Amino acid sequence: MLYHHHDHIPITCAIHSDGSRVTQKILGMGLDGFIIHNSPSTVLKIPKLYARVLPDWTTEPESENQYANDLSGEKAIYERLQGVPGVAKYLGATKDGLLLQYYGNGSLEDHLKNNPLPEWQQRMDWILLIIDVYAACHAKRVLVFDIALRNLLLADDLTIRAIDFANSGLHPLEETGELKEEGYTAMIDVLHVTNIIYSLLAWKKFQVDCVQEDEWPDAEQVPSTVDLPLGDVIAKSWSRQFKTLDELRDVIASSMPEGPANT
């Protein structure tokens, strides 16, 4: 895969950790890695490494590669979360990276962008699945961080599979008390899950940048939930009334309307 923007800028390409060029299709690119289509049924997440392509078509690794994430933290998290329903199936590590099952239906963000409003029951199923998968992460002492529509893939049966734990925090299983790390807390994970719930109900993507408690959005920074099903629950969550995903789930499950046919 070559990157070439202007004639005077050297061509660069993605490389594996052994220096060989990445020749497979790159499906996605995050801050720390590439997702490549490794086989019909698998993808491989590899460190984000580049090389300059020299005039004789040999390659020279970029010096910035020394700062690349080696994915060992994410590997430990996928190992901790193995078997958790709703997490992308982790198939182990190779010399190149992390092997995961391929989900050909794309992300919930793509689905929202490209499809009309789904039936009420489908959206409710997604909402409860999403809360459950991230609550299970918290129960396994994983502080997730990157909770977004783009990181929720759709399996063949349209159930959810969560990916991207590159920035997540792994805490000792025997540890008790609040999950928190450098100002980021489990409540901020609740905020980002709530933004996804709003997005699915309004069928319009909404997200905020919030990585510290003091960046929590105020009422002017979030959309109105008037006339939105479960709008009062979302408004309560945005005003920090739920400390855990379990609390949020209980309230949603108990106040879930049968559903406007297509709201």
Annotate each PLM feature:
Residues T42, G86, L98, R161-D164:
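Protein kinase-like catalytic core scaffold
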